[in-house]
């Protein structure tokens, strides 16, 4: 695909595609890393990455390919894995000599050759720091950091344009070289997509590669340009296979008689069709239409240089069990305190906070709560009745990163929007309208006839002095945490029953580090 230059003019839109992008998805990455760490073959070992110390409803972060072969999906709940393995073993027992197992194995090849073995699997607790370490060292041997966009721990986009001449390779050869190196040094195999823009390489990887036969090492590499995309993908269904097309989008498109990307592309050529798409999706219609035609103007350089006009920082957690209101309030306080430290560490301030509190499905299964609750009821993803979540926003007097100001405001908001009789399961805190502290303009004070300007100035100076002292303390805490670990210094509230900050400090992305 290297060297391909396609220039077209369609409906007044010219595209010059000279770039070559590679998307790489490390296959069952977390599970593969855990297998490699144990000296096991990632393609021949039954393993799930899941924290068994949580409830059996915990989500498995990864499932090894051999275990997926039994019909277990990629991101199941742990109880679903247990149930499926029990079903498989019931069938295997019927075929075993004397209908009895003589042992068990988590190795697929052994299970395939010996029907007297019971299927078992390894449940590996997640180790996010280890996965990040593997991920960061895989690609930088070949590609400079500025040409890599890390989409997730196990998936990257690479702008390979400048490297094809350097290495004297085609894009396919470069992708294969990197994947073979990964396989040789880690035992982890991969799927890759090559395209003339970031969207096409993603689709090549997500759809085309995953529907083609793998080589002897499980490697799949597919390529797309605009013309082959239209030829191969315009009739592909379902639409939800495509990047950024969720069930909601697909349902709205279906009501308009649009079932494929080809349908959307053809529909967009008429003035009526284009207006209808913009009416349905607003400004997002432009991206949908571009993708229907295989266009994507955004480059990795654009992604790296992007700075949103209105930035925000958020933190959320799903509690391990239905939690009483007072404990949820303590956890919210901890999250607000950590949010303030995060802002300070990044040199940012905020003047608006948002809180979302999700209630547990058990609420409406408890007789006393069900009788007394008079609020709105909604259905969750599984069709179960649950009280509608609480959501609210509070504005601060001025942009700050003060833990005292932020926690007090968040507690005021929590008390205002939540129902103290309900059990809580999810909490999300947001700092909105985040800006660098250096960009905050000095406040203009409006004088009036009814207040003493000198007293107001003295009050303002006292507040500023308090904020300055608190900032010094917060910076000292940050320094200790960065040097000795996040749990090296804690507040007294973090030691109370039900507090989660200490355990969260040992996690990355909500999972064990």
Model-derived segments and spans:
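Generic "edge-of-domain/loop-turn" microfeature
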Residues: 54, 165, 199, 318, ...
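DNA-contacting surface of Y-family translesion DNA polymerases
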Residues: 23, 241, 247-424, 444
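Short aromatic/hydrophobic contact patches that present stacked aromatics
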Residues: 157, 395, 428
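A glycine-rich phosphate-binding loop feature that marks nucleotide/adenosyl-phosphate handling sites
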Residues: 196-199, 290-293, 349-361, 423-435, ...
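Short, charged/polar surface micro-motifs in flexible loops or helix N-caps
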Residues: 27-29, 53-57, 359-364, 434-438
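C-terminal hydrophobic structural anchor segments
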Residues: 412, 416-479
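Gly/Gly-Pro- and Ser/Thr-rich, intrinsically disordered tail segments characteristic of DNA damage-repair
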Residues: 2-300, 449, 454-513
């Amino acid at each position: 695909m290297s060297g391909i230059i396609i220039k077209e003019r369609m409906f007044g839109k010219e595209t010059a595609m000279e770039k070559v992008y590679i998307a790489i998805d490390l296959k069952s990455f977390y599970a593969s890393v855990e297998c490699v760490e144990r000296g096991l073959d990632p393609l021949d070992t039954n393993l799930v990455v899941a924290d068994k110390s949580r409830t059996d409803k915990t989500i498995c972060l990864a499932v090894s390919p051999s275990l997926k072969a039994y019909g277990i999906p990629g991101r199941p709940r742990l109880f679903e894995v247990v149930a499926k393995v029990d079903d498989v073993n019931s069938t295997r027992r019927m075929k075993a000599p004397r209908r009895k197992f003589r042992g068990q194995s988590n190795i697929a090849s052994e299970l395939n050759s010996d029907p007297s073995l019971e299927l078992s699997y390894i449940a590996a607790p997640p180790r996010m720091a280890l996965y990040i370490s593997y991920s960061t060292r895989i690609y930088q041997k070949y590609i400079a950091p500025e040409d890599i966009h890390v989409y997730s721990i196990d998936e990257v986009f690479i702008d390979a344009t400048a490297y094809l001449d350097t290495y004297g390779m085609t894009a396919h050869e470069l992708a294969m070289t990197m994947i073979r190196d990964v396989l040789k040094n880690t035992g982890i195999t991969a799927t890759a997509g090559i395209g003339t823009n970031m969207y096409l390489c993603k689709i090549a990887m997500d759809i085309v590669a995953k529907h083609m036969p793998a080589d002897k090492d499980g490697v799949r590499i597919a390529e797309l340009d605009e013309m082959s995309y239209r030829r191969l993908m315009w009739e592909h269904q379902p639409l939800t296979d495509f990047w950024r097309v969720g069930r909601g989008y697909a349902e709205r498109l279906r009501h308009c008689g649009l079932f494929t990307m080809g349908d959307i592309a053809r529909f967009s050529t008429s003035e009526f069709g284009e207006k209808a798409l913009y009416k349905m999706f607003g400004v997002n219609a432009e991206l949908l239409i571009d993708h229907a035609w295989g266009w994507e103007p955004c480059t990795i350089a654009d992604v790296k240089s992007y700075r949103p006009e209105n930035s925000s920082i958020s933190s959320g957690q799903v509690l391990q069990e239905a939690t009483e209101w007072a404990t949820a309030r303590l956890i919210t306080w901890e999250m607000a305190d950590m949010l303030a430290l995060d802002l300070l560490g990044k040199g940012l301030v905020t003047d608006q906070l948002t809180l979302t509190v999700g209630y547990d499905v058990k609420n409406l299964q408890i007789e006393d709560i069900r009788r007394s609750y008079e609020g709105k009821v909604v259905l969750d993803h599984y069709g179960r009745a649950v009280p509608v979540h609480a959501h609210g926003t509070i504005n601060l007097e001025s942009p700050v990163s003060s833990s005292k100001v932020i926690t007090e405001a968040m507690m005021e908001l929590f008390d205002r929007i939540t129902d103290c009789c309900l059990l809580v399961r999810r909490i999300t805190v947001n700092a909105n309208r985040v800006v660098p502290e250096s960009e905050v303009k000095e406040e203009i004070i409006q004088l009036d006839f009814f207040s003493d300007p000198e007293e107001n100035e003295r009050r303002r100076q006292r507040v500023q002095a308090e904020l300055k002292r608190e900032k010094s303390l917060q910076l000292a805490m940050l320094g200790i945490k960065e040097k000795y670990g996040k749990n090296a210094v804690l507040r007294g509230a973090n030691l109370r029953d039900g507090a989660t900050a200490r355990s969260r400090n040992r996690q990355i992305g909500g999972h064990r580090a």
